[in-house]
């Protein structure tokens, strides 16, 4: 079994997570859905930190050869960047899958 790398959320990912949880818990009045999403996100992050290359490599004109990967979490996508030198995984964004992904990736900030 591979060693587990450290995981961190960028400021953008933290803001995304806050927005998603608020939307699910408050706007949809479904705190159970918010808790379930948080659990699924935690599991996806743990998997990414244990197996950094487990997510699909993102092929996009705005991210040429960057090594950014993604994992699907229900209706959402978690974009992350493994750093083998530092043995860290940086979660860059967590976004609703039906958003304009090109626009998200264009300004992902790596």
Spell out what each predicted region is.
Residues 5, 23, 37, 51, ...:
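Aromatic side chains
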Residues 50-85:
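Basic/aromatic recognition patch in beta-strand/loop cores that engages polyanionic ligands
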Residues 2, 52, 58, 90, ...:
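Residue-level signal for pocket-adjacent positions within structured domains
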